Protein backbone atom coordinates (compact mmCIF):
# COMPACT_ATOMS: atom_id res chain seq x y z
CA UNK A 1 0.00 0.00 0.00
CA UNK A 2 1.07 3.59 -0.63
CA UNK A 3 0.91 4.41 3.09
CA UNK A 4 3.86 2.12 3.92
CA UNK A 5 5.86 2.68 0.73
CA UNK A 6 9.01 4.79 0.96
CA UNK A 7 8.19 8.03 -0.87
CA UNK A 8 10.15 11.11 -1.89
CA UNK A 9 8.12 14.27 -2.48
CA UNK A 10 9.94 17.25 -4.01
CA UNK A 11 8.56 20.75 -3.51
CA UNK A 12 9.63 24.30 -4.36
CA UNK A 13 8.17 27.34 -2.61
CA UNK A 14 9.80 30.55 -3.81
CA UNK A 15 8.14 32.95 -1.40
CA UNK A 16 7.01 33.05 2.23
CA UNK A 17 3.34 32.83 1.23
CA UNK A 18 4.15 29.58 -0.58
CA UNK A 19 6.07 28.39 2.48
CA UNK A 20 2.89 28.67 4.56
CA UNK A 21 0.87 26.76 1.98
CA UNK A 22 3.53 24.08 1.69
CA UNK A 23 3.70 23.59 5.45
CA UNK A 24 -0.05 22.98 5.62
CA UNK A 25 0.06 20.40 2.83
CA UNK A 26 3.06 18.61 4.37
CA UNK A 27 1.29 18.50 7.74
CA UNK A 28 -1.77 16.91 6.14
CA UNK A 29 0.22 14.44 4.02
CA UNK A 30 2.01 13.20 7.13
CA UNK A 31 -1.39 12.13 8.46
CA UNK A 32 -1.67 9.71 5.52
CA UNK A 33 1.94 8.65 4.86
CA UNK A 34 4.24 6.99 7.38
CA UNK A 35 7.46 6.77 5.36
CA UNK A 36 7.95 9.95 3.37
CA UNK A 37 10.76 12.43 2.72
CA UNK A 38 10.05 16.04 1.71
CA UNK A 39 12.83 18.01 0.03
CA UNK A 40 13.48 20.92 -2.35
CA UNK A 41 13.16 24.61 -1.49
CA UNK A 42 11.10 25.79 1.46
CA UNK A 43 10.99 28.37 4.21
CA UNK A 44 10.79 28.31 8.01
CA UNK A 45 7.26 26.92 8.23
CA UNK A 46 8.03 23.98 5.94
CA UNK A 47 11.27 23.34 7.83
CA UNK A 48 9.26 23.03 11.06
CA UNK A 49 7.36 20.16 9.40
CA UNK A 50 10.59 18.24 8.71
CA UNK A 51 11.20 19.55 5.19
CA UNK A 52 14.79 19.40 3.90
CA UNK A 53 15.57 22.59 1.97
CA UNK A 54 18.42 22.27 -0.51
CA UNK A 55 18.47 26.05 -1.10
CA UNK A 56 17.62 28.96 1.22
CA UNK A 57 14.23 30.32 0.15
CA UNK A 58 15.58 33.90 0.22
CA UNK A 59 17.77 33.07 -2.80
CA UNK A 60 14.62 32.86 -4.94
CA UNK A 61 13.11 36.18 -3.83
CA UNK A 62 12.61 38.56 -6.77
CA UNK A 63 10.17 41.34 -7.64
CA UNK A 64 9.45 42.72 -11.07
CA UNK A 65 10.97 42.01 -14.45
CA UNK A 66 14.12 44.10 -13.92
CA UNK A 67 14.92 42.12 -10.75
CA UNK A 68 14.33 38.82 -12.57
CA UNK A 69 16.68 39.89 -15.39
CA UNK A 70 19.35 40.96 -12.91
CA UNK A 71 19.09 37.72 -10.93
CA UNK A 72 18.55 35.36 -13.87
CA UNK A 73 22.05 33.77 -13.83
CA UNK A 74 21.68 32.89 -10.15
CA UNK A 75 18.14 31.55 -10.62
CA UNK A 76 19.28 29.49 -13.61
CA UNK A 77 22.05 27.86 -11.58
CA UNK A 78 19.64 27.06 -8.75
CA UNK A 79 17.17 25.48 -11.16
CA UNK A 80 19.86 23.37 -12.81
CA UNK A 81 21.17 22.22 -9.43
CA UNK A 82 17.70 21.06 -8.40
CA UNK A 83 17.10 19.31 -11.72
CA UNK A 84 20.43 17.47 -11.48
CA UNK A 85 19.52 16.30 -7.99
CA UNK A 86 16.12 15.03 -9.12
CA UNK A 87 17.49 13.41 -12.26
CA UNK A 88 19.91 11.37 -10.15
CA UNK A 89 17.37 10.71 -7.37
CA UNK A 90 13.91 11.11 -8.95
CA UNK A 91 11.08 12.05 -6.59
CA UNK A 92 7.76 10.24 -6.77
CA UNK A 93 6.03 13.57 -7.36
CA UNK A 94 7.04 17.21 -7.73
CA UNK A 95 4.84 19.98 -6.30
CA UNK A 96 5.53 23.52 -7.43
CA UNK A 97 4.00 25.99 -5.00
CA UNK A 98 3.16 29.24 -6.75
CA UNK A 99 6.36 30.95 -8.11
CA UNK A 100 5.22 30.01 -11.63
CA UNK A 101 7.98 31.12 -14.00
CA UNK A 102 10.56 29.11 -12.07
CA UNK A 103 8.37 26.16 -11.13
CA UNK A 104 6.76 25.65 -14.52
CA UNK A 105 10.18 25.30 -16.14
CA UNK A 106 11.12 22.71 -13.50
CA UNK A 107 7.81 20.90 -13.96
CA UNK A 108 8.18 20.76 -17.75
CA UNK A 109 11.64 19.18 -17.48
CA UNK A 110 10.60 16.68 -14.81
CA UNK A 111 7.46 15.63 -16.67
CA UNK A 112 9.62 14.73 -19.68
CA UNK A 113 11.38 12.33 -17.30
CA UNK A 114 7.98 10.79 -16.47
CA UNK A 115 7.88 12.32 -12.98
CA UNK A 116 4.39 13.35 -11.88
CA UNK A 117 4.01 17.11 -11.48
CA UNK A 118 1.46 19.16 -9.55
CA UNK A 119 1.22 22.94 -9.40
CA UNK A 120 -0.32 24.38 -6.23
CA UNK A 121 -1.66 27.93 -6.65
CA UNK A 122 -2.62 28.83 -10.18
CA UNK A 123 -0.43 31.23 -12.11
CA UNK A 124 -2.53 34.27 -12.98
CA UNK A 125 -3.01 33.10 -16.57
CA UNK A 126 -6.65 34.18 -16.36
CA UNK A 127 -5.39 37.73 -15.75
CA UNK A 128 -2.45 38.14 -18.13
CA UNK A 129 -0.18 36.14 -20.49
CA UNK A 130 -3.04 33.72 -21.12
CA UNK A 131 -1.02 31.77 -23.69
CA UNK A 132 0.87 30.25 -20.75
CA UNK A 133 -2.06 27.87 -20.33
CA UNK A 134 -0.61 25.79 -23.18
CA UNK A 135 2.73 25.50 -21.35
CA UNK A 136 0.90 24.57 -18.15
CA UNK A 137 -1.02 21.86 -19.98
CA UNK A 138 2.26 20.31 -21.13
CA UNK A 139 4.12 20.80 -17.85
CA UNK A 140 1.73 19.61 -15.14
CA UNK A 141 -0.48 16.63 -14.40
CA UNK A 142 -2.74 18.64 -12.09
CA UNK A 143 -3.27 22.27 -11.07
CA UNK A 144 -4.65 22.81 -7.57
CA UNK A 145 -6.47 26.15 -7.51
CA UNK A 146 -7.37 28.30 -4.53
CA UNK A 147 -10.26 30.08 -6.24
CA UNK A 148 -13.27 28.62 -8.10
CA UNK A 149 -12.99 30.81 -11.21
CA UNK A 150 -9.48 29.43 -11.78
CA UNK A 151 -10.69 25.83 -11.94
CA UNK A 152 -13.32 26.84 -14.50
CA UNK A 153 -10.68 28.60 -16.63
CA UNK A 154 -8.42 25.54 -16.75
CA UNK A 155 -11.19 23.07 -17.48
CA UNK A 156 -12.26 25.25 -20.41
CA UNK A 157 -8.72 24.89 -21.78
CA UNK A 158 -8.46 21.15 -21.24
CA UNK A 159 -6.10 21.33 -18.24
CA UNK A 160 -6.67 18.97 -15.32
CA UNK A 161 -7.51 21.18 -12.34
CA UNK A 162 -9.21 21.02 -8.96
CA UNK A 163 -10.50 23.84 -6.74
CA UNK A 164 -9.40 23.12 -3.17
CA UNK A 165 -10.38 26.37 -1.46
CA UNK A 166 -8.00 28.65 0.39
CA UNK A 167 -6.20 27.64 3.62
CA UNK A 168 -6.66 31.14 5.03
CA UNK A 169 -10.43 30.76 4.71
CA UNK A 170 -10.18 27.61 6.84
CA UNK A 171 -7.91 29.27 9.39
CA UNK A 172 -9.85 32.50 9.93
CA UNK A 173 -13.26 32.23 11.59
CA UNK A 174 -16.34 33.26 9.64
CA UNK A 175 -17.19 35.77 12.37
CA UNK A 176 -13.80 36.71 13.84
CA UNK A 177 -13.73 38.36 17.26
CA UNK A 178 -10.73 40.64 17.50
CA UNK A 179 -11.54 43.11 20.28
CA UNK A 180 -9.29 41.41 22.87
CA UNK A 181 -6.29 41.82 20.56
CA UNK A 182 -6.40 45.61 20.90
CA UNK A 183 -5.13 45.39 24.47
CA UNK A 184 -2.06 43.50 23.25
CA UNK A 185 -1.06 46.54 21.18
CA UNK A 186 -2.12 49.12 23.82
CA UNK A 187 -5.19 50.38 22.00
CA UNK A 188 -8.59 51.12 23.51
CA UNK A 189 -11.83 49.72 22.14
CA UNK A 190 -12.92 53.15 20.88
CA UNK A 191 -9.62 54.06 19.17
CA UNK A 192 -9.70 54.51 15.40
CA UNK A 193 -6.95 52.43 13.82
CA UNK A 194 -5.64 52.30 10.26
CA UNK A 195 -3.48 49.27 9.43
CA UNK A 196 -1.01 50.04 6.64
CA UNK A 197 0.71 47.20 4.75
CA UNK A 198 3.32 48.41 2.23
CA UNK A 199 4.46 44.89 1.28
CA UNK A 200 6.56 41.95 2.37
CA UNK A 201 9.55 42.38 0.02
CA UNK A 202 12.20 45.04 -0.45
CA UNK A 203 10.95 45.99 -3.92
CA UNK A 204 7.38 46.41 -2.70
CA UNK A 205 8.37 48.64 0.21
CA UNK A 206 10.60 50.64 -2.13
CA UNK A 207 7.59 51.60 -4.26
CA UNK A 208 4.74 51.54 -1.75
CA UNK A 209 6.44 52.79 1.44
CA UNK A 210 6.87 56.47 0.47
CA UNK A 211 3.38 56.60 -1.04
CA UNK A 212 1.70 55.12 2.03
CA UNK A 213 3.74 57.32 4.40
CA UNK A 214 2.53 60.41 2.56
CA UNK A 215 -1.05 59.13 2.81
CA UNK A 216 -0.60 58.65 6.56
CA UNK A 217 0.76 62.18 6.82
CA UNK A 218 -2.33 63.57 5.11
CA UNK A 219 -4.69 61.51 7.24
CA UNK A 220 -2.87 62.60 10.42
CA UNK A 221 -3.42 66.22 9.41
CA UNK A 222 -7.12 65.75 8.70
CA UNK A 223 -7.94 63.17 11.39
CA UNK A 224 -5.41 63.64 14.24
CA UNK A 225 -7.13 60.99 16.36
CA UNK A 226 -6.36 58.14 13.92
CA UNK A 227 -3.74 55.61 15.05
CA UNK A 228 -1.43 53.92 12.53
CA UNK A 229 -0.03 50.41 12.80
CA UNK A 230 2.43 49.10 10.20
CA UNK A 231 3.44 45.42 10.22
CA UNK A 232 6.82 44.73 8.60
CA UNK A 233 7.19 41.13 7.46
CA UNK A 234 10.69 40.46 8.78
CA UNK A 235 13.61 42.19 10.48
CA UNK A 236 15.57 42.45 7.23
CA UNK A 237 12.97 44.90 5.91
CA UNK A 238 13.14 47.24 8.92
CA UNK A 239 16.07 49.32 7.59
CA UNK A 240 14.28 49.85 4.27
CA UNK A 241 11.08 51.16 5.86
CA UNK A 242 12.74 53.12 8.68
CA UNK A 243 14.99 54.91 6.21
CA UNK A 244 11.84 56.15 4.45
CA UNK A 245 10.15 56.97 7.75
CA UNK A 246 13.05 58.95 9.20
CA UNK A 247 13.68 60.84 5.96
CA UNK A 248 10.52 62.98 6.20
CA UNK A 249 7.94 61.42 8.48
CA UNK A 250 9.71 60.97 11.82
CA UNK A 251 7.03 62.97 13.64
CA UNK A 252 4.22 60.59 12.67
CA UNK A 253 2.99 58.41 15.52
CA UNK A 254 3.22 55.00 13.89
CA UNK A 255 3.41 51.70 15.72
CA UNK A 256 5.70 49.47 13.64
CA UNK A 257 5.56 45.76 14.47
CA UNK A 258 7.44 42.75 13.13
CA UNK A 259 5.19 40.23 11.42
CA UNK A 260 1.67 39.79 12.78
CA UNK A 261 0.10 41.45 9.74
CA UNK A 262 -3.08 39.50 10.37
CA UNK A 263 -3.33 40.82 13.93
CA UNK A 264 -2.66 44.37 12.73
CA UNK A 265 -5.53 44.07 10.25
CA UNK A 266 -7.76 42.37 12.80
CA UNK A 267 -7.55 45.25 15.29
CA UNK A 268 -7.96 47.94 12.64
CA UNK A 269 -11.04 49.80 11.49
CA UNK A 270 -9.72 50.16 7.94
CA UNK A 271 -6.82 48.56 6.05
CA UNK A 272 -4.60 50.24 3.46
CA UNK A 273 -2.60 47.61 1.61
CA UNK A 274 -0.78 46.77 -1.57
CA UNK A 275 -2.48 44.16 -3.73
CA UNK A 276 -1.86 40.50 -3.00
CA UNK A 277 -2.70 37.98 -0.30
CA UNK A 278 -3.16 40.75 2.29
CA UNK A 279 -6.34 41.82 0.49
CA UNK A 280 -7.71 38.30 0.92
CA UNK A 281 -6.82 38.27 4.62
CA UNK A 282 -8.44 41.66 5.16
CA UNK A 283 -11.59 40.40 3.45
CA UNK A 284 -11.67 37.21 5.54
CA UNK A 285 -11.26 39.38 8.66
CA UNK A 286 -14.21 41.45 7.37
CA UNK A 287 -12.20 44.67 7.27
CA UNK A 288 -12.98 47.52 4.84
CA UNK A 289 -9.90 48.28 2.79
CA UNK A 290 -8.25 50.40 0.13
CA UNK A 291 -5.84 48.66 -2.24
CA UNK A 292 -3.01 50.24 -4.21
CA UNK A 293 -0.10 48.97 -6.24
CA UNK A 294 2.74 50.40 -8.32
CA UNK A 295 5.23 48.55 -10.52
CA UNK A 296 8.56 49.71 -11.80
CA UNK A 297 8.40 51.44 -15.18
CA UNK A 298 9.81 48.46 -17.10
CA UNK A 299 7.53 45.93 -15.42
CA UNK A 300 4.47 48.11 -16.01
CA UNK A 301 5.34 48.67 -19.68
CA UNK A 302 5.53 44.93 -20.29
CA UNK A 303 2.68 43.69 -18.10
CA UNK A 304 -0.01 46.36 -18.45
CA UNK A 305 -0.85 45.68 -22.14
CA UNK A 306 -1.32 41.99 -21.36
CA UNK A 307 -3.69 42.34 -18.40
CA UNK A 308 -7.07 40.75 -19.17
CA UNK A 309 -9.02 41.42 -15.95
CA UNK A 310 -10.77 44.59 -14.77
CA UNK A 311 -9.50 44.40 -11.17
CA UNK A 312 -6.32 43.60 -9.24
CA UNK A 313 -7.76 43.21 -5.73
CA UNK A 314 -8.83 39.65 -4.89
CA UNK A 315 -12.12 40.67 -3.21
CA UNK A 316 -13.16 42.43 -6.43
CA UNK A 317 -12.07 39.51 -8.60
CA UNK A 318 -13.90 37.00 -6.42
CA UNK A 319 -17.06 39.11 -6.34
CA UNK A 320 -16.93 39.82 -10.06
CA UNK A 321 -17.56 43.48 -9.27
CA UNK A 322 -15.98 46.40 -7.46
CA UNK A 323 -16.48 45.89 -3.74
CA UNK A 324 -13.47 47.91 -2.58
CA UNK A 325 -11.53 50.86 -4.01
CA UNK A 326 -8.32 49.96 -5.82
CA UNK A 327 -5.67 52.12 -7.46
CA UNK A 328 -2.93 51.00 -9.86
CA UNK A 329 0.18 52.78 -11.16
CA UNK A 330 -0.54 56.46 -11.97
CA UNK A 331 -3.96 56.22 -10.28
CA UNK A 332 -2.21 55.16 -7.07
CA UNK A 333 -1.66 58.74 -5.95
CA UNK A 334 -1.86 60.39 -2.54
CA UNK A 335 -5.06 62.36 -3.21
CA UNK A 336 -7.13 59.41 -4.45
CA UNK A 337 -5.95 56.98 -1.79
CA UNK A 338 -6.36 59.47 1.06
CA UNK A 339 -9.89 60.36 -0.01
CA UNK A 340 -10.93 56.69 -0.16
CA UNK A 341 -9.39 55.87 3.22
CA UNK A 342 -11.09 58.86 4.86
CA UNK A 343 -14.44 57.86 3.35
CA UNK A 344 -14.13 54.41 4.90
CA UNK A 345 -12.98 55.80 8.26
CA UNK A 346 -15.98 58.13 8.30
CA UNK A 347 -18.49 55.47 7.26
CA UNK A 348 -20.56 54.10 10.14
CA UNK A 349 -22.29 51.25 8.28
CA UNK A 350 -20.39 48.54 6.42
CA UNK A 351 -22.99 45.79 6.90
CA UNK A 352 -23.56 45.14 3.19
CA UNK A 353 -19.83 44.95 2.47
CA UNK A 354 -19.31 42.58 5.41
CA UNK A 355 -22.17 40.37 4.18
CA UNK A 356 -20.55 40.06 0.75
CA UNK A 357 -17.18 39.34 2.33
CA UNK A 358 -18.83 36.62 4.42
CA UNK A 359 -20.45 34.99 1.39
CA UNK A 360 -17.07 34.78 -0.37
CA UNK A 361 -15.47 33.43 2.81
CA UNK A 362 -17.96 30.54 2.92
CA UNK A 363 -17.22 29.68 -0.72
CA UNK A 364 -13.47 29.53 -0.06
CA UNK A 365 -13.77 27.53 3.18
CA UNK A 366 -13.21 24.03 1.77
CA UNK A 367 -10.63 22.39 4.09
CA UNK A 368 -7.95 23.17 1.51
CA UNK A 369 -5.01 21.30 3.02
CA UNK A 370 -6.96 18.05 3.21
CA UNK A 371 -8.27 18.42 -0.35
CA UNK A 372 -4.75 19.15 -1.62
CA UNK A 373 -3.30 16.15 0.23
CA UNK A 374 -5.98 13.79 -1.08
CA UNK A 375 -5.42 15.02 -4.65
CA UNK A 376 -1.66 14.46 -4.28
CA UNK A 377 -2.27 10.97 -2.89
CA UNK A 378 -4.47 10.11 -5.89
CA UNK A 379 -1.69 11.18 -8.26
CA UNK A 380 0.80 9.06 -6.32
CA UNK A 381 -1.49 6.03 -6.29
CA UNK A 382 -2.09 6.28 -10.03
CA UNK A 383 1.63 6.51 -10.76
CA UNK A 384 2.67 3.69 -8.43
CA UNK A 385 0.04 1.10 -9.37
UniProtKB/Swiss-Prot annotation:
Which residue positions does the secretion signal occupy? none
**A Pfam family this chain is assigned to:** LpxB
Residue ranges annotated as coiled coil are none
Gene Ontology MF annotations: lipid-A-disaccharide synthase activity; phospholipid binding
Provide a GO CC annotation, any one: membrane
Query: Which E.C. number(s) belong to this protein?
Result: 2.4.1.182
Biological process (GO) annotations held by this record are: lipid A biosynthetic process
InterPro entries tied to this protein: Glyco_trans_19
Which reactions appear under catalytic activity for this entry? a lipid X + a UDP-2-N,3-O-bis[(3R)-3-hydroxyacyl]-alpha-D-glucosamine = a lipid A disaccharide + UDP + H(+)
Tree of life domain? Bacteria
Q: Pathway involvement?
A: Bacterial outer membrane biogenesis; LPS lipid A biosynthesis
Keyword Lipid biosynthesis among record annotations? yes
State the family it belongs to: Belongs to the LpxB family.
Q: Which HAMAP family match?
A: LpxB
Name the job this protein performs.
Condensation of UDP-2,3-diacylglucosamine and 2,3-diacylglucosamine-1-phosphate to form lipid A disaccharide, a precursor of lipid A, a phosphorylated glycolipid that anchors the lipopolysaccharide to the outer membrane of the cell.
Q: What is this protein called?
A: Lipid-A-disaccharide synthase 2
* Organism of this sequence: Legionella pneumophila (strain Paris)
Q: Which gene encodes it?
A: lpxB2
